[in-house]
Amino acid sequence: MNFGEAITAIKNGKKAYRQGWNGKNQYVELATRISYVNSSGIIINVKHDASGNNALAFVGTSGVQLGWLASQADMLAEDWDVRED
């Protein structure tokens, strides 16, 4: 599948990955209802649905990278697939 199809699958709650990625169990999914801890240690829940409260999350061997940005190679690749879990 191509990147556009992978993004559609991710927006529909699926986990997508590239067959060409080196690491096993790496995938991208949609993170919603994002919150963070500010410098004072207070948890801030971002509640702005109108402007968006979603981000792509890359889950890999080193943890989660929130706000993942696809490379040009990722965007042009035709080896995207969807995990069934």
Question: Model segments located where?
Answer:
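Extracellular/periplasmic catalytic domains that process cell-envelope and extracellular macromolecules
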Residues: D49-A50
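Catalytic phosphate/metal-binding cores of nucleic-acid and nucleotide-processing enzymes, i.e., regions
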Residues: M1-V46, F58, M75
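Short, compact, well-ordered microdomains
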Residues: N53-D85
